[in-house]
């Protein structure tokens, strides 16, 4: 009889502890807005386009990012990876897929960044965001192309909101 009573008490207690343990990570993984603006330069050595830019964004503060994509100039698409660096050095790593609408003076570029990892407070980060940017067709004196734009989406990270 005592064994049955103990089992009847321990089972609900174990269920409560397990529920609480599983709820803590779920609560810590809250989605938060991720947005900002940037400007920089694109260096094109076909088929590779390398972007280096600086800007400001939520969760990142002052930021820098580098991106390297392989472009398909026949259909104006690209794919590659990017590295976003926050003011304190914490990083977000993404894969990139995008497309461009060509024009005589500018290309209008839209890219989807999917978070693949991070460091510091972005360790364990997940999510995606969209980059909308303008690429100036005429090169600058140094041979690079000016680019500027914005990004918006959501990020889920155990410590991103802190």
Positions of the model-derived regions?
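Bacterial N-terminal signal peptides
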Residues: 12-23
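Bacterial N-terminal signal peptides that target proteins for export
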Residues: 2-14
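Beta-strand-enriched cores of mature, soluble protein domains
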Residues: 27-162
């Amino acid at each position: 009889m005592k064994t049955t009573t103990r089992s009847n008490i321990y089972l609900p207690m174990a269920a409560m502890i397990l529920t609480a343990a599983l709820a803590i990570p779920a609560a810590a993984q809250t989605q938060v807005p991720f947005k900002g603006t940037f400007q920089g330069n694109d260096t094109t050595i076909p088929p590779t386009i390398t972007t280096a830019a600086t800007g400001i964004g939520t969760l990142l503060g002052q930021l820098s990012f580098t991106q390297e994509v392989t472009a398909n100039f026949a259909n104006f698409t690209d794919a590659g990876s990017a590295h976003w660096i926050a003011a304190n050095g914490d990083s977000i790593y993404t894969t990139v897929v995008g497309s461009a609408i060509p024009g005589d003076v500018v290309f209008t570029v839209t890219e989807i960044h999917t978070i693949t990892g991070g460091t510091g407070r972005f360790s364990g980060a997940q999510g995606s965001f969209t980059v909308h940017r303008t690429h100036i067709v005429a090169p600058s004196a140094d041979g690079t192309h000016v680019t500027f734009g914005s990004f918006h989406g959501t990020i889920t990270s155990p410590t991103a909101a802190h």
